[in-house]
Each structure stands twice: as structure tokens, then as C-alpha cells.
Design a protein with these regions (language model features):
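Class I S-adenosyl-L-methionine
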Residues: 1-122, 241-252, 260-262, 266-349
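Helix N-cap and loop-to-helix transition residues
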Residues: 16, 123, 137, 212-215, ...
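SAM cofactor-binding core of SAM-dependent methyltransferases
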Residues: 90, 96-170, 207-208, 212-213
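SAM-dependent nucleic-acid methyltransferase catalytic core
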Residues: 68-83, 139-254, 258-269, 283
Length: 349
């Protein structure tokens, strides 16, 4: 397997410098990426003369081991674990099936390296978004997104065209709604959040993000990986999972629930889905205790402290059950506010 990779490409090609950089950095040992810009003179006639400068880009990376490459979801999901995949992977233990109970953007599941993955999210629309990256041909998906952007004149910060595109989607009958259409609209929304009203109409306001080269690189690499994985998709209240899945059959359970101390689109009102509060948090603790009693290994990602407020119920529960507790330090979320995240394990490492 190649360890050192060089790529020569010029600025007349179809791929942008930013796109190539995003792709290569995904596979690069940290700090190894380099790019040299080499100007050159291209043959010119009277039609092409003085149109633009010409460059040859020479890219270099030292390639990571395959099991160290991190694939990021194209969905900018609130509470995404994309930035803390390494410590999560370091503390996983062997099993045949990995169950991502609160699947969200699927950043953890797609990087977990288990034989069989089970994705679950109570939000059936989010489940459809994630499964769409497996179900559609990636090239066709990208062309659909680009055509929808062009047809509806979508651009970052353009409120008028965004609201019109959003209304177009919301007013379609359910059998005419294409999940790729929703994905495209989300890309131009505020912080690319996934928010719906009680009628399941998408209602996030316009934002200043767009379908850029970074999103494109994530879409391509994530779609390739999810097509290669053996994934089962579910959309259930997690409490019902033991009735559907035999969790005792060589499974590892990963839980990344909403955070009680933070405000996301999942807990500032139910918005057609289940919210999150003290009662539901205690229900979660009991669910994990039940897994522990059956010797089913599980990992919980959660927030211990945020804006000076500590989750004492979480702390007491960890100590009472003698669970393993791993601090991850301050994590900066979408809001820009740091939060103290932890991993809780019901097994020894």
C-alpha cells in the first residue's frame, strides 16, 4: 500500500484546489499535507489570451493507516461526534454488531469498523437522509443537488430564494418529496440544522452556508463507505429496541442522546418528535442499567458540565454504579460554547 502520495493537477481542471485539499487531508497523517503552486505558461490563441493565470498544483500527503481514516457525515448534525472519533474508537471493544441507538449523522457508526451496523433514530426523516447516501448512486445524487440549486437560484444568505425553495418542498405531497431535495435545502439553512414543526414541515431559517467543496468531499467519501458497510436502518423509540433486536447476541450498544444541559433543535420543543428532559434522562439511565445486568457492553456519550452548570444526577449515577468515566475535555459545539463531554462505559478497559 502506498504510504507517500503525490498528486499533480492544474487549475484548468474540473476539481477545485479546495476540494482536492479536503479529500487529501482526510487520508493524511496530521500535519503532512503540503501544496506547492507552480505557475506555468499555457499555449494561448487570440480567444484564450489573458483570460486567467495558469497554475500547476503539486499536492503531497503521508497516508494514514486505513483504520485511522475518519469519515464525516455530510449532515452537520447537532451534537456531532466527528471531532472526537479517535477517543471513542480507542475505547470500543470487539463485537459482531454495533448498534448506534441515537444515530443522528452516523459519524460514530460509519467509523466503528464492526461487521454489522444498526442505525436507529426516532426522527424518521433523519433516518431517510442517512439511508439516502447508501440508496442513491453518488454521482446521480450530486447532479440532483446541483440541478436543484440552479433551478431555485440557491446561494448562501439569499433569504428570498431559500424561503421559496423551502416552501416548494413543504407544499409537495409526501409521495412527491424527494429526500435529496430536503438535503439540498438543509445545506443553505441556518447552521444546516434539521428542524421541523409539528406538521413535519422543514422550518429552519436561511443561513450563510452552502454546497461547498468541503461538503462535497464528505458526501463522496461518506457515501462510498456506507455503500460498503452492512447497515440496517431503523426509526424507533430506543426503549423499544430490545423488542426488535436480540441485544445479547454479540452486540455493542452506543448511545449519544440529546444533552439535558444544552439546547438543540431536539430539546427546545418536541417539534413532532420526542423531546428530552429529566424524566427521559432517568429512563435512559435505567436502560443502561438493564443492559449492564445482562452483560451487554455499552458506551454513553454525554455532557457533564455546560455554562457552569453540572449534571449532578449523571455524576451520582456513574458513581453509584461504578461505571468507567472518561473525560474528553472541552468540546466546542455549533453554538460556539464549550461543553465538558464524557464517555461512560459499563465495562473495564
Amino acid at each position: 500500500t502506498a504510504r507517500h502520495i503525490f498528486l499533480s493537477y492544474n487549475n484548468d481542471g474540473d476539481m477545485s484546489k479546495d476540494f482536492i485539499e479536503a479529500i487529501m487531508k482526510r487520508y493524511a497523517v496530521d500535519g503532512s499535507f503540503e501544496c506547492i503552486t507552480i505557475p506555468y505558461k499555457k499555449y494561448e490563441n487570440w480567444k484564450s489570451k489573458n483570460k486567467k493565470e495558469h497554475f500547476e498544483y503539486l499536492f503531497y500527503i503521508e497516508k494514514k493507516a486505513n483504520n485511522e481514516v475518519i469519515y464525516e457525515s455530510p449532515l452537520n448534525y447537532i451534537g456531532s461526534k466527528a471531532k472526537i472519533i479517535p477517543p471513542i474508537k480507542q475505547n470500543l471493544i470487539p463485537a459482531n454488531t454495533f448498534i448506534d441507538v441515537f444515530g443522528g449523522g452516523f459519524n460514530v457508526g460509519i467509523n466503528s469498523n464492526y461487521n454489522h451496523l444498526i442505525y436507529n433514530d426516532i426522527n424518521f426523516i433523519v433516518k431517510e437522509l442517512i439511508s439516502s447516501f447508501r440508496d442513491y448512486d453518488t454521482y446521480d445524487y450530486i447532479m440532483y443537488v446541483k440541478k436543484f440549486i440552479e433551478k431555485h437560484d440557491l446561494e448562501k444568505g439569499n433569504k428570498e430564494t431559500y424561503i421559496a425553495a423551502r416552501a416548494y418542498y413543504n407544499n409537495l405531497p409526501d409521495n412527491k418529496k424527494d429526500i435529496r431535495m430536503l438535503f439540498t435545502i438543509i445545506l443553505y439553512s441556518f447552521q444546516q440544522q434539521i428542524r421541523f414543526n409539528s406538521n413535519f414541515e422543514y422550518n429552519n431559517p436561511v443561513g450563510v452556508r452552502w454546497f461547498n467543496d468541503c461538503i462535497l468531499s464528505k458526501l463522496i467519501s461518506f457515501s462510498r463507505m456506507i455503500k460498503e458497510c452492512d447497515v440496517t436502518f431503523l426509526s424507533l423509540d430506543y426503549i423499544k429496541l430490545p423488542k426488535v433486536i436480540d441485544l445479547t447476541n454479540n452486540c455493542f450498544v452506543y448511545l449519544d442522546p440529546p444533552y439535558k444541559l444544552t439546547t438543540g433543535s431536539y430539546n427546545d420543543g418536541k417539534r413532532g418528535f420526542k423531546g428530552w428532559d429529566d424524566k427521559l434522562e432517568l429512563e435512559l439511565f435505567q436502560f443502561i442499567d438493564n443492559l449492564t445486568a445482562q452483560n451487554i457492553p455499552c458506551m454513553l456519550s454525554y455532557v457533564l458540565e455546560h455554562k457552569g452548570e453540572k449534571n449532578t444526577a449523571l455524576e451520582d449515577w456513574i458513581n453509584r454504579n461504578n461505571y468507567t468515566y472518561i473525560p474528553l475535555g472541552d468540546i466546542i459545539g455549533i453554538s460556539g460554547q464549550p461543553r465538558k463531554e464524557i464517555l461512560v462505559l459499563n465495562y473495564d478497559i
